[in-house]
Design a protein with these regions (language model features):
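Hydrophobic alpha-helical transmembrane segments
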Residues: 1-189, 202-243
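Glycine-rich phosphate/dinucleotide-binding loop and adjoining beta-alpha-beta core of small-molecule
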Residues: 199
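Substrate/ligand-engaging "lid" and interaction regions
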Residues: 195
Length: 243
């Protein structure tokens, strides 16, 4: 528990410096590698929504089943690699010395959480809006959302920021804290792996509609409880601040 609290305090103090290697980057590289190996190179039009013109078109049943199986294989490989690597690091550190284990556990917990990063990036949006700097606000919000922000007005920028903060409070703070508290940093890393897969392949596009289905569904399941806890906390916070 002390290592968990220490990791949380490290996140609050330092956030995620851009220069620091982060496990999510390695997870992302592995997912991209497996995506390419299982689905081949990306082609023009594959990122369009499946129901968009020139999108997925019609895929036969055999192709659908094949892509779903590949998606399940992706999930298994990424979760297995995450569990093995993080488990070796975690258990290996404690095998060397309890103090080494404590330090490694605190650092792993620190890297699992993203509270300070979320606060820092969302504050940039707020500051730009307070200065009536719409271009700056659009740029700042583009760093935390996955949509085109060039056409957003002030209300649109604010709405996008609030929506992202609400969602990221769940999958960047509450859910990682919950799973790390329940199963230590190894389970916390597994959660981050699922969340990263969903953010990379969990789209209803031509390429990922079936391939990314397993990752997207698993992400929905593991976020069901944390999302509701986050909603209650956000409602309570809004009432407390009279927002």
């Amino acid at each position: 528990m002390l290592a968990f609290v220490s990791g949380f305090l490290l996140d609050c103090l330092f956030g995620d410096p851009y220069w620091m290697p982060h496990p999510v980057r390695f997870m992302g590289n592995l997912i991209s590698f497996l995506d390419k190996k299982l689905m081949g190179e990306k082609h023009k039009g594959e990122e369009k929504k499946a129901d968009a013109p020139n999108g997925a078109g019609v895929k036969d049943d055999a192709t659908i089943r094949s892509e779903r199986r590949k998606g399940i294989l992706l999930v298994i490989c990424v979760l297995a690699a995450t569990a093995i690597v993080s488990g070796i690091i975690f258990l290996g550190a404690y095998a060397i010395h309890p103090i080494a284990g404590f330090v490694v556990e605190a650092i792993m917990t620190y890297q699992i959480l993203a509270a300070r990063c979320l606060q820092k990036e969302s504050t940039k949006v707020y500051t730009a809006l307070k200065k009536n700097d719409l271009l700056g606000a659009r740029y700042a919000v583009s760093m935390i959302v996955g949509r085109d922000t060039n056409v957003l007005d002030e209300a649109g920028v604010a709405r996008a920021a609030v929506e992202t903060v609400a969602e990221s409070t769940s999958d960047g703070v509450i859910a990682p804290m919950l799973y790390t508290a329940l199963g230590g940093p190894v389970l916390g890393m597994i959660y981050k792996a699922v969340n990263t897969m969903d953010s990379m392949v969990g789209y209803k596009s031509s390429r990922y509609l079936y391939f990314g289905r397993a990752a997207a569904k698993l992400d929905d399941v593991i976020n069901w409880v944390p999302a509701r806890i986050s909603a209650l906390l956000l409602i309570a916070g809004s009432a407390f601040l009279s927002v």
